[in-house]
Every structure is written in structure tokens, then in C-alpha cells.
């Protein structure tokens, strides 16, 4: 299979993977991917859950969607990911839809790629089957686009370490949206425990940053949705004062524009965006926001209601607002951004992501709360406090990556392997007895020692 990939795609693939001209550091980057599918959740080639969405996957929706983005952000480049069924559906509407998206690659420079298993491929398929899906799905993308085209990345939701290794070593693809940061008790699978900015994954677990050269998989692992750091603490969702507090509240439309309406939804989206493009940029030297905006949402109200909303007005205002507030921001494809990061970081040794976020006052983003995140190769650490009351910080997450980790086995026939999370010391979701918040100096001595080596300032004098 490795030889096949090289023979079929060698020349054009080399052309497609030239290093990006721009640089990572000093940049603000937005990546934006959209999913084209037939059924709501296509977990295997033959099995799907949820409604048939084919009536809202037509050239009309795609054209309106892409023209809205171009109007708001001329020069923007986005990533389109086709499901297995959408790649192979021979109805006229899907043939025309595929042809239209190919023109967007030529016109705008968009990326066209494949998504296996509706974000949840490993929850329903063996690793071997996922590799087959990746190979044949990517081959089909190349056939549709023509000219020896190969995408720089894959959209996958969650993807196991073995499959990430396969992408890098056999398919020659070194960027994958392979984790959904903080997702737990939402939809069809859990994968809580990673860091939220790019990293090289470990061969042990896709959520774990590689610890050394032998452990490193050369496939940059990207988050799928930027979420509000305070909302992310919730396991799934909960009702508070007759409102639904949702853990995925951030820059995606379902939890914002479609749930709250345009005005309030935009406020929540900009709060999550500014956390990275303002304070995060200063702390980390670059900033990244990413959104997954499924194509079905253009007219999803026809199937799912959404209070009659489609979110497109909000999308245009969000993109226009980003350009106005951060005029240096770039909207590039997921593959380009991942390769940009890969060109700068050769391993995880220098990773030291830090974020400080105060709530915007919308639902789970509580206005009196401040959260600080520290993320590196060895661990992630989250400290929470009531900043208005000037309360003492509490550790709500401490996940060690320097300890062994193991992914679940392949799902048994006809069954699902739902939880692929990496949790050890304390987890932000608070689902286990050991997850009770505690002061930094109440952690185990060896845990304090590890943190002190990285961030001595957290312990005072």
C-alpha cells in the first residue's frame, strides 16, 4: 500500500507539500472546515445514525455558504471534508456538489479531503478498517479533484495513534484534525485529555504528546473546535436557570448562533476568539482559532428546527468582525496551518502553551470566573478562581503525559467503544471522585515537583 501511494501521488504530492511561505510566530490564524455528508452520523461505510440530510446537501447550499465566506473574507481558504457516502453518492445533486467544490479549490485555493466515520471512526471500526477507509477515501478524493491532487490534511474528529501513524508513514499526510479538545459526554464518542493547540501525538495515545523521538508520530494533531475554556469544564451539558449550559460553547454555530440567536451568539463567539487572538497571542507568540461548520447547518433548520435560524448572518458578521478587529489574521486551510506549525516545531520539547480566560457572562462562561491553562509535553494544568472575590486558585485539571497511556482495544463486532479519553490525576469534567478541586500545594509531592520545574512562579517565593 505504501508503494501504491508513492507511485500514484509522488510528483504532485511533493508539489502540494511545499513549505508555506508565511511564518507561524507572530501570526493569528483561523482555520475553518466544513463536512459534506449524506446521513447525519455515518459511523461506518454501511451504518449511519440520525436523519438523512441529502435534501440540504445540494449545490445551492454549498454556493450560498462559500459565497458568504468570500463576501466576509476575500482571499479566505477553507477545508472541505467529504464523508464516505458523499464521495460515492451517484445522485445528480451529489455529482454536481462534488464538481462545484472542485471549482472552489481552483478559484479560492480551498482544500478538499476525507472524513472517516463521522468524527468517531475508532469508536465503531477496527484500526485496520479505518486505515482501509483512509486509503480508499483519499484515493477517491484524488480521483474527483484530478491532476494528481492530494490534500495536506484529514478531518477525523478523533483518530487513534495507530491510524495517525498510518497517515504519516503510508499516505504521506502529516496533518490531521485528530482530537476534539475537551469533548466528553457529547454525541457518539469521548476523547477528553489532550492539549488544545497543535502537537505531535504519542504512539501510545492520540491525546498524549509524544515524549521523545522514538515515541513521535509525524502527523500534527489538531483540535476540531475552539471552545470557551470555562464552558469546557462541563461534562456534556446541564440546565441552569432554565438555560442549557453546553460544554462545546465557543466558535461553533450550534451552541451559539443557532441556540442563542445572532446577537448573543456572536458575543459568545467573539469572547472565545479574543481569548486567543488577544491575550493568548501575547503569551504564546502566535494564536489559532478553529471552527467546524458542517454544511448541513446552512439549511439544517429544515430538519432540526434550530428555532428557524440558519446562522449565516452570524457567520458573515463573525468573519467580518475578525478582519476588522484583527486585520492581520489569516484564514488558511487546515493543512496549510498544520504544515506551518510542523515547519516551526520539529518535536514537542518547546511546547509551552498558556492561556488566561475570564468569563463573558454567557451561560457556562461565568463572569466571575478566571481559568488559567498551562500545556506542555509533560502535562496540562488548569487553575480556576473567582477573580471578583479574589479567591485562591484551585487545581481543576492536572493530566500527566510523562506516564504510560493506553488506548482502548478495537470495538467488538456490532458494539461501540465510546470512551477514548486520557484522564489520570485530576480532570476538569469532575466525573470521578478524585476530580475534586484542590490547592496546588495539596497535590502529591512528586506532582508539585514536576509543575515547579516548569512553572516555579506558581508556588511563590
Would you name each region that the model predicts?
Residues 16-19, 152-282, 358-363:
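Active-site-adjacent pocket scaffolds in enzyme catalytic domains
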Residues 342-386:
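Surface beta-strand/loop "capping" patches
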Residues 1-7:
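Bacterial N-terminal signal peptides
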Residues 386-460:
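Acidic-aromatic substrate-binding/catalytic surfaces of carbohydrate-active enzymes
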Residues 76, 81-158, 217-252, 283-302, ...:
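Metal-dependent polysaccharide deacetylase catalytic core of the NodB/CE4 family, i.e.
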Residues 51-67, 92-101, 128-138, 260-277, ...:
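Well-ordered, non-membrane alpha-helical segments in soluble/globular domains
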Residues 10-14:
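Boundary at the C-terminal end of the N-terminal hydrophobic targeting segment
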